[in-house]
Amino acid sequence: SHAAISAEISGTTYTNEQIAETMRETWKECHYLLDPHGACGFRALKEGLKPGETGVFLETAHPAKFLETVEGIIGETVEIPAKLKAFMQGEKQSLSMTKEFADFKNYLLSL
C-alpha cells in the first residue's frame, strides 16, 4: 500500500547551489567525483544518518554524462575513461514508443 511504502521511503529536494556545494566539498575532501544526481543521494544519506550509522548510496551515471556542469562546479577537467569515451562517440540507438504499458509489453513480446 502507499502508506506502507511511505513509512519506509523518504524524499528530499535540493537547490542547484546545494548540489554544487555537495559536489565541490566531496571532491575536495574525498577526491570522489559525484554527478549531480549522485550528489543529491549522497547529501540526503549524510543528512539522514543517525550517529554511529553507516550508509550506502548508488551512483547511476558517470560524471562525464554531465561533463560541462561537473567541470564548471569543481573547476577541473574531468578525465573520461577510454571505454566511456568510445561509447559516447558511438551512434545513438533508440526506438520511439508511446508511454502506454501495453505498447511497451507488445514490443518486448515481439523480440
Regions found by a protein language model. Name each.
Residues 1-111:
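PLP-dependent amino-acid enzyme catalytic core
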